[in-house]
């Protein structure tokens, strides 16, 4: 996105999209993917320590909960996270119905999927002021709309976790210290949620800007 913005300012929209430009960068796709995941993991871990802020929304599960979930907008770049609704809140697990995918014609898929989230993957959301939160039902309730994600994205039939979109933002820049080439740039948690690039557009504190030079 930063490359697009730079080219737009230098050449204009017409030359950018129809001028036949060939652009090469030093970005490494593998490191870019690793960097994005590292930033997301760090933001999520930090945000969890601040506590659970509650469900995204609440819906009635008596009817077709898939239709109700389908009406809730979600960022397009959240995969493998999925929006879901709590169908059962048992002592040791929650049964979560996942938001149906949309077909090419825009209609919702008729198939309804559900996954189980064990208490061990939910207990981080316990309130520190309530020592008796020892079951899923003490944290979640039927009808709660939440985010869940597979513990292993390559194994969707495995364990799933309760997730929460972090309020804190962040950015990441990875460079080769020998050549100065930029290998990865991550501007935030979700580009769909915010196009502000915290790695490029944010103004860092002078002390923080000087640290890479000191530690190098």
What are the functions of these language-model segments?
Residues 1, 10-204, 208-213:
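Periplasmic/cell-envelope proteins involved in peptidoglycan metabolism and beta-lactam response
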């Amino acid at each position: 996105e930063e490359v697009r913005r730079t080219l737009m300012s230098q050449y204009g929209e017409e030359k950018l999209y129809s001028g036949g430009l060939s652009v090469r960068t030093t970005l490494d796709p593998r490191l870019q993917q690793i960097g994005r995941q590292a930033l997301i993991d760090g933001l999520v871990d930090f945000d969890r320590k601040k506590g659970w802020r509650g469900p995204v929304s609440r819906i009635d599960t008596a009817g077709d909960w898939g239709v109700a979930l389908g009406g809730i907008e979600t960022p397009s770049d959240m995969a493998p996270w999925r929006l879901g609704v709590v169908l059962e809140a048992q002592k040791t697990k929650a049964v979560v119905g996942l938001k149906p995918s949309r077909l090419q014609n825009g209609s919702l898929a008729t198939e309804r999927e559900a996954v189980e989230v064990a208490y061990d993957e939910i207990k981080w959301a316990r309130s520190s002021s309530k020592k008796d939160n020892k079951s899923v039902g003490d944290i979640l309730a039927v009808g709660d709309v939440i985010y869940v994600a597979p513990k292993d994205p390559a194994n969707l039939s495995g364990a799933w976790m309760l997730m929460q979109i972090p309020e804190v933002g962040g950015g990441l820049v990875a460079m080769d210290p020998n050549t100065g080439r930029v290998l990865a740039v991550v501007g935030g948690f979700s580009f769909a949620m915010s196009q502000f690039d915290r790695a490029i557009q944010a103004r860092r504190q002078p002390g923080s800007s000087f640290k890479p030079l000191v530690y190098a």
